[in-house]
Amino acid sequence: MEKDRNVKKRVITAGTFDILHPGHYEILKFAKSLGDELIVIIARDKTVERLKGRKPIIPENQRREMVEALKPVDKAILGSLNNKLEPILKLKPDIIVLGPDQMTFDEETLKKELEKHNLHPKIVRFKNYKKCPFHSSFDIVKEIVKRYCNKE
């Protein structure tokens, strides 16, 4: 994807976004505040299964559609099955926002990998998400199991 000349700053972030919760929305609002265009890379089902040892609950295309429907998001795309850097190399972002628990890359490793491709985006780690009872998809699933599956 070529950069649109009218876009001043392209921001990207990536994640699974399996069961949407306030933490997801907070990072998306933050990411959008850093630029003019926010593109979100949605992890593929097979990638999530490989990294987390379990399939996402919501299929990848539905997750992409839901994220793209959120106000801060200009576009959501599916990530690559083969190379996690591929969409970043195509999008050529000015800023990359990493989530607080996103450990696929640390900032320095990502920076060095992108420099090999002559890309020099600013890399920002989002740290100040709103604390709330269910700020992770895993916590939501645990609560559902507790409330509905442990009944006699």
Curated annotation (Swiss-Prot):
Name of the featured protein: FAD synthase
Top-rank EC class of the record's enzyme: transferase
Family statement drawn from the similarity comment of this UniProt entry: Belongs to the archaeal FAD synthase family.
GO annotation terms (biological process): FAD biosynthetic process; FMN metabolic process
Cofactor(s) it depends on: a divalent metal cation
Catalysed reactions, semicolon-separated: FMN + ATP + H(+) = FAD + diphosphate
EC number: 2.7.7.2
Subunit structure: Homodimer.
Protein role: Catalyzes the transfer of the AMP portion of ATP to flavin mononucleotide (FMN) to produce flavin adenine dinucleotide (FAD) coenzyme.
Species whose genome carries this gene: Methanocaldococcus vulcanius (strain ATCC 700851 / DSM 12094 / M7) (Methanococcus vulcanius)
SUPFAM superfamilies for the chain: Nucleotidylyl transferase (SSF52374)
